[in-house]
């Protein structure tokens, strides 16, 4: 943004406009308000003024440095006596200073400093004075509180001492009294003893005893008084020492407060100093300041840095003041701008490696020549608090990106990985779990990032369409049972012959056509009626506006008719009933109406909302009435869609053409589809390379409710997928790949679940026979219908396993897959190429071709029936009654029998019955008639029989003779 006035320039510099106006006036640029124009010359004058006020010199060179380099060689012997040549390089450096310019610059600097004492400086000083006053008031308040606290403590201490002293005195008095009483008692006892011993002496001795007793009492009193006096003196000395300690502490606190007040009340140094002769050596030129315009003018004395610690005796007197602009490093802290506040601010600065002061206060290499060589700044830097970041970790992230998210070097991440026992490079990709562990290890907080859902763009795009809604043609789906005449009816409407060219006379693909009638355009969807094409009918009902339900007048309501009614009701679509084949003699429209009423489709003449139209696809009777009713329903629905908008639609059918690649039949539902648009259909995307109508003629655009066939997709889309036009091919590819990843994850999860389920079933039920199949069909809908129909044939003993199903011809890859999985290849309306046929013959792979879905289902059903285990059935061939029992040595028991029913064969099994209870089941060991072995004995003849491993035969037993036969099972 160009700064043409004062306000804009202040906004660019991020400073108040009032401060900028004051600086402009100080620089000699007369600007009265913020709206005044500001030229480049004015900015240059302001910059020049601020540079000079900050101590910078003008651009003229007043100093020149000459460097001379001299190289020489010397020869010197080493320890071994070998002479070596050493290169010696001598560098000499000399600086010449123009003294007059230095003095003149100093005078000008002093004058400019005097001019710089403007309102901004006064305001700043007033603000500092106010802050100092607040600080002094706060410190004084703290001092008063501290003194009050000390006085309270002193009073409490005195009270405690007085109480302790009184207690001590009382105890001493009691002790002295006790001691005196004891001494008196002892003296009395002694006196009594003496009196008892000297009773016999003369009377003058009694007076001497009284005198001795009085002397003892006086001595005891003197001793007690002396002890009490010593105790009182000790207590007084102790109290005096404590009082002196308290006085010292109070004096120290008062001295500290007084020192703080004196420091804060000390007047600041005058900005304009007395003119002193300049020093012969020019001070070092400070580093060029960036952002000079952001700082107000300050006196030259503020250029000095805070003093550093120096050895004892090396410090200059505190009252000595350096000349202006001399940059004296020995100046007392607080003498320059900010003082100790600046020092604290520096400690809060960014922590860097090495010297960040430009060498001014560092060693002898940096700073002014020959000054303070042994001085070093030992400024303490407070430790910085570690920064804990919230790192969003995606599913995969490289080492470099992860380090960037944590604002550290990639080498730190690599170190942590090495400690964890994993060697990585900077470009190696890590998974989400590992990356989160590393983030936590480095002290940050890891958050699993949400997946970027590209499909959110589609929702935003849908909400942003505000195109004008215009009327569109209705989409009519023709549904009904197989062979009820749906396609023939459409052929008569379109004047075409589609039904005649279909295999088996049945529709196996969903077709889309649009018809121009005198009252408007109608788009028809022709759906198959076979039970296998349930998904096709569901898609037709989903994409339609009106359903035409075709019912044969001679056949009535059939299972697929009921299914079509259910699809229409689920989609909330109005139904128009066409009672077909009324030209047949056995037609009974009234019975059809009654059956449809039972299914919930009530005709208008019965008070319902579904028009019933009797038609004949053969003669064309009633077709005009049918179209009239369809268009009437469309007018009631008021169908509208945006035309000038990106196209949206649905995939009706899709296939893989050998020359064209993936081909999809699309019904445009809204907007206009143009050739060259970028389309997205499920997991497929691409640019529309070619667009054909239902007659195979090229077209450039397709509006709402128009079916077209497009080419140029990346793969065959799924039938029923939504089609949308996107402005960017990159975004379409991103969404398609995202959907492919989701589909792959779901597919793998389903496969894993299926594997586990099948494993558990096999463990519980034993081995199950599998019939592996590879299915290749011409279009997506037929492939889907065939797969679903074959999977329904699975039983508990034989299961259909679809190894692979796809759209297109049979290739070598399919044959190789069949070889590996021992599968049968089924081609529905497709053929194998020459290489695939040769490979199949070489490997013995069975390839079956079908063009009618009935035939494919029936043959697979027959193959599964052959895989079923045969059923074993018992057939009773005869009954034998035991008449007599013979015991034959070395043979065992032989029963003489009469065949009462049927026939007895030598190879038959036998069941022994006694009183109609089975006691043994086994095989015949021998069958004889008159000592001859025979193969069979018929009813009414006698024979001899022996049963293997059974000798407990008695008269009256019965032998039930039977055979076990195997019967083939069917599904």
From Swiss-Prot:
Biased segments, Low complexity type: 105-114, 182-202, 304-326
Subcellular location, record wording: Cytoplasm
Sorted UniProt keywords: Cytoplasm, GTP-binding, Initiation factor, Nucleotide-binding, Protein biosynthesis
GO MF term list: GTP binding; GTPase activity; translation initiation factor activity
Domain tr-type G: from-to ranges: 471-640
Binding site for GTP: 480-487, 526-530, 580-583
GO cellular component: cytosol
Keyword NADP attached: no
CDD domains linked to this entry: IF2_eIF5B, IF2_mtIF2_II, mtIF2_IVc
Keyword Zinc: no
Region described as G5: spans on this chain: 616-618
Stretches for region Disordered: 48-86, 100-381
Region feature G4, mapped onto this chain: 580-583
Biased composition (Gly residues): 356-369
Biased composition annotated in UniProt, kind: Pro residues: 277-286
InterPro entries associated with the record: DNA-bd_dom_put_sf (IPR009061), EF-G-like_DII (IPR053905), IF2_assoc_dom_bac (IPR013575), IF2_II (IPR044145), IF2_N (IPR006847), P-loop_NTPase (IPR027417), Small_GTP-bd (IPR005225), T_Tr_GTP-bd_dom (IPR000795)
Residue span of region G3: 526-529
Segment forming the signal sequence: none
UniProt-listed SUPFAM superfamilies: Initiation factor IF2/eIF5b, domain 3, P-loop containing nucleoside triphosphate hydrolases, Putative DNA-binding domain, Translation proteins
Region (G1): 480-487
Domain of life, per lineage: Bacteria
Record family assignment: Belongs to the TRAFAC class translation factor GTPase superfamily. Classic translation factor GTPase family. IF-2 subfamily.
Role summary: One of the essential components for the initiation of protein synthesis. Protects formylmethionyl-tRNA from spontaneous hydrolysis and promotes its binding to the 30S ribosomal subunits. Also involved in the hydrolysis of GTP during the formation of the 70S ribosomal complex.
Identification of the protein by name: Translation initiation factor IF-2
Name of the encoding gene: infB
């Amino acid at each position: 943004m160009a700064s043409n006035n004062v306000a804009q320039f202040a906004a660019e510099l991020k400073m108040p406009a009032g401060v900028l106006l004051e600086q402009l006036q100080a620089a000699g640029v007369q600007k009265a308000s913020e709206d005044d124009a500001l030229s480049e010359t004015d900015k240059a004058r302001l910059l020049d003024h601020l540079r000079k006020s900050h101590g910078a010199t003008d651009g003229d060179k007043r100093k020149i440095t000459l460097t001379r380099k001299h190289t020489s060689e010397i020869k010197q012997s080493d320890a071994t006596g070998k002479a070596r040549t050493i290169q010696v390089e001598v560098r000499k450096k000399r600086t010449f200073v123009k003294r007059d310019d230095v003095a003149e610059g100093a005078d000008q600097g002093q004058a400019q400093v005097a001019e710089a004492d403007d309102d901004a400086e006064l305001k700043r000083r007033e603000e500092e004075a106010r802050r100092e006053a607040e600080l002094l008031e706060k410190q004084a308040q703290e001092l008063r509180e501290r003194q009050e606290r000390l006085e309270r403590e002193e009073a409490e201490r005195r009270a405690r001492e007085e109480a302790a002293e009184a207690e001590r005195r009382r105890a001493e008095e009691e002790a002295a009294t006790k001691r005196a009483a004891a001494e008196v008692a002892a003296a009395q006892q002694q006196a009594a003893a003496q009196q008892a011993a000297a009773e016999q002496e003369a009377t003058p001795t009694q007076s001497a005893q009284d005198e001795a007793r009085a002397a003892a009492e006086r001595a005891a009193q003197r001793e007690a008084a002396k002890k009490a006096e010593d105790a009182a003196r000790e207590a007084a000395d102790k109290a005096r020492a404590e009082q002196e300690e308290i006085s010292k502490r109070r004096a120290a606190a008062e001295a500290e407060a007084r020192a703080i007040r004196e420091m804060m009340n000390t007047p600041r140094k005058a900005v304009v100093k007395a003119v002193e002769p300049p020093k012969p050596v020019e001070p070092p030129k400070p580093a060029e300041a960036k952002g000079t315009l952001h700082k107000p003018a300050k006196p030259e004395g503020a250029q000095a840095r805070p003093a550093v610690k120096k050895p004892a005796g090396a410090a200059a007197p505190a009252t000595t003041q350096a000349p202006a602009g001399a940059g004296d490093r020995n100046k007392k802290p607080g003498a320059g701008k900010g003082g100790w506040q600046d020092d604290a601010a520096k400690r809060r600065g960014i922590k860097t490696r090495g010297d960040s002061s430009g060498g001014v206060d560092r060693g002898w290499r940096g700073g002014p020549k020959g000054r303070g060589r042994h001085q070093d700044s030992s400024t303490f830097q407070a430790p910085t608090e570690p920064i804990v970041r919230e790192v969003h970790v995606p599913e995969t992230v490289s080492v470099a990106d992860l380090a960037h998210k944590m604002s550290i070097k990639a080498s730190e991440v690599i170190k942590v990985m090495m400690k964890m026992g994993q060697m990585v490079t900077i470009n190696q990709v890590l998974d989400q779990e590992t990356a989160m562990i590393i983030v936590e290890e480095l002290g940050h907080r890891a958050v699993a990032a949400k997946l970027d859902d590209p499909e959110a763009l589609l929702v935003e795009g849908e909400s942003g369409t505000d195109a004008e809604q215009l009327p569109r043609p209705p989409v009519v789906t023709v549904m009904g049972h197989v062979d009820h005449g749906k396609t023939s009816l459409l052929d008569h409407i379109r004047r075409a012959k589609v039904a005649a060219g279909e295999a088996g006379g049945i529709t196996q693909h969903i077709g889309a056509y649009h018809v121009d009638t005198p009252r408007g355009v109608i788009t028809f969807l022709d759906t198959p009626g076979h039970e296998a094409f349930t998904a096709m009918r569901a898609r037709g009902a989903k994409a339609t506006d009106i359903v035409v339900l075709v019912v044969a007048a001679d056949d009535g309501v059939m299972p697929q008719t009921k299914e079509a009614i259910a699809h229409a009701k689920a989609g909330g679509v109005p139904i128009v009933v066409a009672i077909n084949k009324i030209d047949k003699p056995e037609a009974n429209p009234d019975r059809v109406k009654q059956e449809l009423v039972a299914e919930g489709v009530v005709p208008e003449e019965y008070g319902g909302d579904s028009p019933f139209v009797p038609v004949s696809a053969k003669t064309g009777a009633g077709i005009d009435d049918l179209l009239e009713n369809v268009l009437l329903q469309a007018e009631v629905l008021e169908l509208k869609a945006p035309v000038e908008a990106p196209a949206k639609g649905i995939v009706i059918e899709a296939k893989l053409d050998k020359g064209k690649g993936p081909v999809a039949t699309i019904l445009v539902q809204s907007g206009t589809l143009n050739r060259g648009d970028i389309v997205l259909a499920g997991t497929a995307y691409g640019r529309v390379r070619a667009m054909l109508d239902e007659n195979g003629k090229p077209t450039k655009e397709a509006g709402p409710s128009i079916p077209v066939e497009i080419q140029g997709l990346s793969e065959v889309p799924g039938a029923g997928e939504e089609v949308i036009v996107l402005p960017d091919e990159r975004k379409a590819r991103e969404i398609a790949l995202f959907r492919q990843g989701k589909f792959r994850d779901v597919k793998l999860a389903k496969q894993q679940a299926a594997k586990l389920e099948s494993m558990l079933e096999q463990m519980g039920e034993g081995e199950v026979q599998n019939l592996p199949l590879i299915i290749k069909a011409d279009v997506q809908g037929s492939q889907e219908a065939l797969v679903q129909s074959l999977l329904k044939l699975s039983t508990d003993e034989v299961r259909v396993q679809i190894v692979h199903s796809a759209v297109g011809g049979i290739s070598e890859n399919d044959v190789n897959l069949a070889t590996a999985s021992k599968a049968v290849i089924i081609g529905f309306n497709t053929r194998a190429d020459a290489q695939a046929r040769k490979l199949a013959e070489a490997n013995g792979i069975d390839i079956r071709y079908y063009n009618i879905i009935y035939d494919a289902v029936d043959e697979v059903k027959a193959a599964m029936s052959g895989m079923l285990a045969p059923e074993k059935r018992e057939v009773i061939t005869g009954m034998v009654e035991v008449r007599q029992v013979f015991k034959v040595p070395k043979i065992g028991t032989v029963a003489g029998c009469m065949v009462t029913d049927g026939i007895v064969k030598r190879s038959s099994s036998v069941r022994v019955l006694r009183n109609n209870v089975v006691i043994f089941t086994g095989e015949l060991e021998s069958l004889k008639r008159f000592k001859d072995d025979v193969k069979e004995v018929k009813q009414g003849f006698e024979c001899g029989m022996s049963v293997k491993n059974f000798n407990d035969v008695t008269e009256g037993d019965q032998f039930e003779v039977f055979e076990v036969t195997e019967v083939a099972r069917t599904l």
